């Protein structure tokens, strides 16, 4: 995909995620909120033309993982592992461009959020 096409796709996913978050904030699951926080921490926006293609791809994959997570929780025919695979691919793209990010993870022991440097 060309960079301009990636930027348009990125903008599309931004609109979709904001629509989901605005209309259904109480129905939006924690996984989607966590992915959107990570996306915001990346500070990669559709209009940032100076960013690498791999960074744009990672942002798109994070947003699409958020959408997939929302759909999996609200529809029966969307597999729940789709969001996880998209999230894994996003981090793979970030690691390929040597981008260090902070990931908010749910601590399995007591439900508190913990910060981890990846």
Curated annotation (Swiss-Prot):
InterPro entries: UPF0058 (IPR002753), UPF0058_sf (IPR036519). It comes from the Archaea. SUPFAM superfamilies: Vng1086c-like (SSF140371). PANTHER family: UPF0058 PROTEIN MJ1205 (PTHR42203:SF2). Belongs to the UPF0058 family. This is UPF0058 protein MJ1132. It comes from Methanocaldococcus jannaschii (strain ATCC 43067 / DSM 2661 / JAL-1 / JCM 10045 / NBRC 100440) (Methanococcus jannaschii).
